[in-house]
Amino acid sequence: NLTQSEVRKIVKQLENARLIQKDNTKASNNAFGAFAGQKQVTVQLQQIYLDWQRQQIFRELSSRFMRLSSTQKNNMDRTVVMADNPASARYQESAKIDLRLQELDQAGISDESASLVKKLEELNKLLDPTNEPRPKLALEKVKAELDPALEGALTDIKGSRLQSAAGNERRARGAMI
């Protein structure tokens, strides 16, 4: 990280270069030292900025997954309500419409999740996993937990297996958090 003393040292070298105008060699040495110090500071500032950008990307992905988990929970709650309805009510036209809406909502959740996972994969390709393991670990969780749960929830909703769908939706929500 950039320290106050490094900045003070560079400023002092620049001031010395300006003050020692009679001795060109000393002035040049101070100016070159200050220039080299400025370059180091610039490189450090660029690194700090890149680290900040990376953290912003992580925060944005985390925030979007949290919002998506909330959407998944709402969808799960509606699935539970539908599953609790008497079997005879499931054959009514309104229940069929509700089931179709559940299916569309779940497909939308899966699509948005796929979009976020794609960004995570891009981030994983850019970063060295030994220095920044979070994208790789998140992708492992996606493959092991999220993808199967989302796929199972959608398949179960399409097959009118609402209790199983609710369980898969719960697992998907848990994997998003």
Regions found by a protein language model. Give the residues of each.
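Mature extracytoplasmic or organellar-lumen-exposed domains after removal of signal/transit peptides
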Residues: 1-177
